[in-house]
Amino acid sequence: MNISAYILLGVVVFLILKLLLPNASKRFLKLQASLPTSKIRSIAKGLAKVEGKLLMKNPLFSPIKMTPCIGYYYLIEKIDRDKEGHNSYSTIHEETQCNPFEIEDTTGKIEVVPEGIQLFLMENTHQYTSGEKRYSESLLREGDEVLLIGYADAKGGVPFLRKDDKYKLLGITLVSSINLWNKYQPLLRSFLFTCVIIVSLIIFILLQ
């Protein structure tokens, strides 16, 4: 087998693993497509998906702009530049911080205990570059329309949402972001599948 075939085989293996291996993001995206949306007033105990508007209780202040927010994802990356001047980025530091908050829909509101929360498909709210580092933050703010998946529990007869122990998940995203994902995800999956087929055919030809 020549070196080109080895490289292409590695690409195929990478694409297959990327498609098949489970992670928190894939669990969240799969569950948001299969779970029905619960109304807050009638939410049942167990894994639940809710949609609504964020209500802030005690604000956090974001690392870059000191913007009052409910929560944030903060990322610091090292910038590497190749001989052609193209940049690549590697993570130096990342963190998610979130204070307790509420979600409100047309039927009521419910508190969210944010321990272990993960933010998915979030656009950068602020980003800048300094020297060989890039700094980015994505914010959850008062009034944002969101989709959240977590475990609906109750204490003293009062329902709340927390991280689900079985799926190891308390995930949140903007409704606008998940709508875009659901619209274009089938096209992305078809593209990746087509890439795997094409590369596999090239490897087969190189082996002849």
Give residue ranges: language-model regions.
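OB-fold and OB-like single-stranded nucleic-acid-recognition modules
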Residues: 2-208
